Amino acid sequence: MYAIIETGGKQYKVEEGAVLFIEKLADVEGEVVTFDKVLLVSKDGKVTAGAPTVAGATVTGKVEKHGKAKKIIVYKYKAKKNYRRKQGHRQPFTKVVIEKINA
């Protein structure tokens, strides 16, 4: 059984027990989070697609931890003009373990 959910402007294919690194959520570590935007559910070979979401379907997971991704460097310059800017960025994320798919 699997489902496709939408969170943080992205879509993820999830199964029970799967570990996801998603855009940061405001929930506290150890808290149970429910995803209501379920776009597709597959159960025993039967696929149910929503328009745009599957009615009554939810996915629950547990927030494991919050963190920041590896640093990326943003560097811009203009040739021959002595203009250089260097900036780093670390995107915050939330690690979620999927517990149950309710379809």
From Swiss-Prot:
GO terms for biological process: translation. It comes from the Bacteria. GO terms for cellular component: cytoplasm; ribonucleoprotein complex; ribosome. One of its GO terms (molecular function) is structural constituent of ribosome. PROSITE patterns: RIBOSOMAL_L21. HAMAP family: Ribosomal_bL21. This protein binds to 23S rRNA in the presence of protein L20. Part of the 50S ribosomal subunit. Contacts protein L20. Belongs to the bacterial ribosomal protein bL21 family. This is Large ribosomal subunit protein bL21. It comes from Brevibacillus brevis (strain 47 / JCM 6285 / NBRC 100599). The gene is rplU.
